[in-house]
Amino acid sequence: VTNAIKIFAQVAMVQRRGAMISKKLCAGLLVLVTPQLVGAQTMFSTNDMVYKGAIRVPIGTYGDSRMGYAQGPFEVMDDESSSFMVGHTKDQAVAEFSLPPFSLAKEISELPMAQNKQPFVTVFDRIPDGNPQGINRITGLLFIEERLIVNGIEYYDAAADNTDTTFFIQDASQLGSSSVSGFRKLEARVHVSGWMTEVPQELYGLFEKEYIFGYANNTPINSRHSIGPSAFGVGLASIINSNPGDEIPTTSLIDYSLANPLAEDSNNETGENNLWTEESRAFLGFIVPGTETYAVFGTSGGHNSGVGYKITQDDGTVCPGFCPYKASDIYNYYWLYDINDMISVFQGKMLPHDVRPYEYGELLLPFQDQGGKPKLIIGADFNPATSTVFFMLGKADTLQSNYEAAPLLIAYRISLRGEGAGSESPPGAPSSVDVQ
C-alpha cells in the first residue's frame, strides 16, 4: 500500500458546465438558499478527500455473531468513539465497537484494533408484531436521539410486493435489552430503504426535508429497485414521530427503474457502458457540506470485459448469477451528482430518472490490492460532525484467521479546495489523494 491513493475518473458526457450555465445555476440557488451559502459553494471532487487512516475490526464471536463475512452496514457516532456494525450476513445481528484513533500505518499488522463494546444481538426476531414479510437483510443504520433507526429488505422478494422497510432499536446504548419497534413503511419502499444521511443544515430549505434516504439494485429482483443510486427527501419528524404500521412520506429527487435506468446496456455488451452495470452497487449517498454535490460511493464491474449470467469466468469460477467475464473486472467506484438537478426535480422541472452524475469512476483504496481480485467496499458512512467518510473494505484483513477474513475500516476527511474555488466549473479528472 502506498502513501497515496489514485483515483481514476470518468467525467460524464453531459454538456452542462461553463460559466454561463454555472451562473444560471447560482442564480437559481439565490431564490432557495441564503446568500452566504451561495458564496461558499463548489463542486466536490474526489481530490477533496484526504486519507485519515485505517483500523482493524476483531473477528472473534461476540454474542450472536462475528465480523467474518460481515454484511456491511455500519453507523459511526458523531464523536467517532464507537460504531454500530452489522455482523455475519447469515446472522443479521448488530453490535457496537469502540474505535481507536485511525492510523496511517502501511501494514495491516500495525493498524490498531477496535474493541467490542456491546455484543452482537439479533433484531428481526425481537419485533413485537413479528416479521410477516420476511425482511431478512439490514441495509442501513442511523443513530437519532438515542435510537438506532434500521432499514431492511427481503433479499429475494420475488413478488416485489414488500412494504415493510424500517424499525427502531429504542435504546442504542442497551442493544441486548432495548425494546424494538417496527415495522414502518417508507413510501418509496425498497427504492429508498438503504442509506440514511443528514442534509446539511443550511440546505434544509432546499427540499423541505432533513434527511436523504437512498438505495440501488444491490440485491435480486430488479423490478422492485432503482436501477442506479437513488435519493429521496425524508422529514425528521415523520421518522421519529412514526408508529409501527405508519407510512413515512418520501420525496423523489433521484430515482430510476427498469424502464428508465441510469444506464442502458446493463450487461455492457457494447463495451461502452462505464457508468452502471448489473455488477454496480451503491452503499452511501450524501450531500457534501459546503458544496453542490450529492456523492455516492459503492462498487462496479464489467466495464472492461462485460457481464454475463451464470457464466464461467476466466479463472474458472462458475457464477450463481450475474458477474463479469473477467473475474478481476470489479472495482470500488463513485458517482457525483449536481444537487441543482435534484432541486429541479423537487420543483417539477425535471424527472427523477433524467438526473445524471457529472463525474464517476474507479476509486483505488489502501489495502484493496492484495493479489487476485481487489477487496471491495461492503458498507460506507458519512459523519457530518467531522466531515469524514468511512469505508468498510470487505475481507481485507486476512491476518486474524486462516479460515475467514475480517473487514478494515478506512477513513477520509473531506477538505474542500479553496473554500469555493471551482464553483465556476466542474472538477477535472482527479489524479490522486495525498496521505496527510
Protein language model regions, located:
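Loop/turn-rich, solvent-exposed surfaces of beta-rich toroidal or solenoidal domains
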Residues: 272-370, 380
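Beta-propeller blade signature
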Residues: 96-110, 160-183, 224-246, 313-343, ...
